[in-house]
Amino acid sequence: MKNILKFLLPILFLLNASNFYSHDLKGAIASDDRTPKNTLRDTYRNPYETLSFFGIESDMTIIELSPGGGWYTEILANYIHYPGTLIAAHFSADSDIGYYRRSRANFEQKISNNPMYGRVEIVDLDSSLGDLESVDAVLTFRNLHNWLGPKMDDIFSNTFAVLKPGGVFGVVEHRAKPGTSMEVMKKSGYVTEKHAIEIAKKHGFELVATSEVNANP
């Protein structure tokens, strides 16, 4: 069985069994544990509709690729609970790039300061991500433009390998106009839907659905 690819294009587009912080999805989004300034973006990022489209359930094992400052991590950590696990694939703490090291350190500090994140695991983005066929879904939000080139191939290949058969790769990205060149995509931070899907299919994914839920008005 091929793994499943779901795209949301364009964009403004754990807790143990007695986890105190676990909620249903709407409760996780409404939780006071979220950073107040992050909640202001809900109207644009549509987290309930987005995660529902990807079919995310609270007992899944999920990898979030390149979570940055943890905008979606705040929601997922509140939602995913035993026997599920949330795994954050972040920059390497030993990266030669200072921004990557600082971003990883800030993320680690964020999750260490709140018991809600007690079962969140961290792995390196440039690693194999985990054991073969070990996770139910892999998600990434507005990151593809940072990976254009060989890095995208590596990440997509590792993502396919770590997903269980029939697992979901959920992608949200800024959508470039059809025909946009690679050079412009790299400079603009926007990626054509065609290119993203082609790379995914190259690594074994099957596209099953796209959504306009995060489309600009």
Spell out what each predicted region is.
Residues 182-210:
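Conserved Class I S-adenosyl-L-methionine
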Residues 124-125, 146-159:
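A short, conserved alpha-helix within the catalytic core of class I
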Residues 87, 166-175:
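Conserved beta-strand signature within the Rossmann-like core of class I S-adenosyl-L-methionine
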Residues 99-129:
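S-adenosyl-L-methionine
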Residues 58-68:
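Conserved class I S-adenosyl-L-methionine
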Residues 25-58:
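Class I SAM-dependent methyltransferase Rossmann-like catalytic core
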Residues 128-138:
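A short acidic, Gly/Pro-enriched loop at the edge of an enzyme's catalytic core
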Residues 77-78, 153-168:
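A short glycine-rich, Lys/Arg-flanked "PGG" loop and its adjoining helix->strand segment in the class I
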